[in-house]
Design a protein with these regions (language model features):
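Macromolecular interaction modules
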Residues: 1-265
Length: 265
């Protein structure tokens, strides 16, 4: 199974209501007719009140209206579907119904690491390092409902993939999994694929997709509030992240376009 993940907005001067009416009423029915579609689900953006810009919420933050996945048995099946109707993925002109900003990637069915359970190899050489809490570890209510901060990033041009992974998996996620209130933490390495000639889609731009799950209160205490937030270890190479994007969602608030009414799993 391969998952074609896409995040998008509607063009400027197109209202959210009009964009959703186009997406649900025009685009989705056409996608359902493509050959080889195994699963088709979408999550709407939610606003959980994370202030930005801030240390834990860089700008832009929560900038997409939806995260959607379209699943096929393999990449060849996706190619067949895409080539049958490439116009479905074109960007719309300003003030016209269709897609505005659109970012996509391919990932596998299962994460590379379920970080609350798994230890990436990069963890081990840094395992004895302690977390830096200048104000002390914050107290968190573990029973509050969580949201998912679903984010993607790529490494800076001056950073090799290996050096970027050493920092992200060796430091950032090793520290992140220890944050109080962290209850969901999974990361996928992107699957690189041959890009379609002339296509506007650039699925190989990104390095990883990560899902981080905690309550809004925990997120703010751990990563936003200057008095309580952790100070993550910085890379000696400087800023190794070249680009970043995210959307806030709840995994159980999902539109299943192939099986309307089916409960989220």
């Amino acid at each position: 199974m391969i998952r074609f993940i896409h995040h998008f907005n509607y063009p400027s001067e197109v209202s959210r209501a009009d964009g959703e009416a186009w997406y649900l009423g025009t685009h989705v029915p056409l996608i359902r007719e493509l050959p080889g579609v195994v699963r088709y689900r979408s999550w709407r953006q939610i606003d959980v009140g994370i202030p930005y810009p801030s240390a834990g919420a860089p700008t832009p933050h929560n900038q997409f209206v939806r995260r959607t996945e379209l699943c096929f048995e393999d990449h060849a099946a996706w190619q067949t579907a895409y080539r049958s109707a490439p116009q479905l993925w074109s960007r719309a002109p300003e003030r016209r119904l269709g897609f505005g900003e659109f970012e996509c990637m391919f990932i596998g069915e299962e994460p590379e690491f379920d970080l609350l359970r798994d230890a990436p190899p990069q963890h081990y050489k840094y395992i004895t390092l302690q977390l830096w809490w200048p104000g002390g570890r914050p107290e968190i209510d573990e029973n509050e409902e969580i949201f998912i901060d679903s984010y993607c990033f790529f490494y800076a041009p001056h950073t090799s993939f290996a050096d970027g992974e050493d920092w992200y998996l060796g430091h950032h996620t090793r520290e992140g999994k220890q944050l109080p209130g962290m209850r969901h933490y999974r990361t996928w390495r992107m699957i690189r694929v041959p890009e379609e000639p002339g296509s506007p889609l650039k699925p190989n731009r990104w390095a990883r997709l990560t899902e981080l799950g905690m309550s809004p209160t925990a997120y703010i205490a751990n990563m936003v509030n200057e008095e309580t937030r952790i100070r993550f270890t910085r890379s000696p190479l400087g800023n190794v992240i070249g680009g970043w994007m995210n959307i806030s969602i709840k995994l159980n608030q999902v539109d299943d376009f192939l099986h309307p009414g089916r409960a989220a799993s």
